[in-house]
Structures are given as C-alpha cells and as structure tokens.
C-alpha cells in the first residue's frame, strides 16, 4: 500500500470548523506581528478550519476526491504558497481524497521546503511534481501520464477509485490522461466555493486588515494626486505602500484619468493628470491569501 495511505488522516473536529464569531464587538484590525499579550490571527486554527470546511463540502458531494490546480484552492487546503509567478502555470496541485489528508505536488525545492517548514502537512504528502506548465512541457514526455497513474493508484488505495473526482481548473491534456487512467472528471470548483463561502473569525480579521491597507493606499493617493503626476506614478506608489505593509499579491491598480475614464479601459498608462480631471482608482490586493 502507498505510504501516503498507511497513516491515519488528521481528524478535524466540530470545534475546528466553529467560525468563532463575536458579533458583540467591532471587527478588529489586528497587528501583524505575533505577540504574547493579545490573541491575534491563529494561522494553525485557520488551517484546520479551512481543511475541515473542504472535507465537509467533499463529504456532502458525490465526489471521491478534489483535485485542485487553482492556487487559491491549494492555499486554502494546504496553507502553502510560493511566488506569484506560479499562479498561472497549472503545475502545482493538491489531491484531497474523501476522508483523507491533502497531498501536495510542488516544484522540487518547494516540496522540500514544505517538509521543513509546514509541519501541519505530513512530510510524505509533500511531493515533487511537474506536469505541463501550460503547454511548455509536451505531453509526449509522459509527465502527465505518470502523475495521472500515480493519483489513480492513490485513490484506489483510499477506497474511492470508482467515484468521480472534482477538478477546479486543468489543462486539457492532463484531463485526458486522468480519464485514460480510469478516473471520471466532474466540476469541483463549486464544491470548493461552497467550502470557502463561510469565513472564520480569523479569515474575517485578515480581510479587515487587507481593507485597512487599501484605506491607507487611498489616503496616499489623495495626498499625492496633483497636476503633473502620471497614472503610472500613482500605481508605483500604491504598489510600494501595499508590499511594504505585507501584501502578498497586488493583483492590479487601475489608475485612470481625464478622457480615459469613459469608457473604462481597466488599465493604466503614463497619462499625466491635468487640473480639473476626473480620476478613477481601483485597488485589488490580498493579505495572507
């Protein structure tokens, strides 16, 4: 039997998936350092909550496992992250079997890093892997076939080989190899969205911190906006502000001025702001996922 299936899965209790709301107080904007005199975000508690939510959503579905290539879903289930460059490569993935622990395939050095620094994951469940890199690696090399057969073997050992697996996003050649390995593919994104829909108190605290950072960014814009400043100048200032305050993904800063405001182009240029211009800004960023 595969080593991954020998050890008992981590048991998530009802208390683990208690969101711990306290609506009798205002939502806190917590500091980001760990301190001994205040309870702040408990990241291990948040991991167990998220894993429990995903497991419960999986149990409520007709799926035998979830196969996740979406970076947001991978982070939700495993509490792991590498650089933003990997977000669109579709070459890290997680398999969550019904009643089991998440198994993560990542770039080789990242997998070793997870074994050292992510003790909430079983070391043997942090595996090196590579598939298509969005077509960069030709399927003829056999990497997709290898990993599809590997996952089929794991699901057989987990007792769910005949049940469909839910996938969030996937390269077509990888899906074809999974089907050749005898697996039935269904939509798993809706199952994950149902799991992620209800936020815990820890997640809400992080959302509030992210919003506070954006509040500060808008105040910076208010201070810096004047004739002669270019749209891209504002974008650079806001990116610096957010990353200095701990943002892990500034997805976009829309900075639009003057005649560019209508119709909305959804990007920024080097246009210089002039007196009396209408201006529009939109900030998309995340803090701790």
Predicted regions and their residues:
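A composition/biophysics-driven feature that prefers long, compositionally simple stretches
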Residues: 1-213
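Signal-transducing coiled-coil linker helices
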Residues: 43-46, 226-234
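Hydrophobic pocket-lining residues that define ligand/cofactor binding sites across diverse proteins
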Residues: 58, 225, 242
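Conserved short loop/turn motifs at secondary-structure junctions
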Residues: 164-167, 221-230
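Active-site pocket-lining segments that scaffold enzyme catalytic pockets across diverse folds
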Residues: 211-218, 231, 239
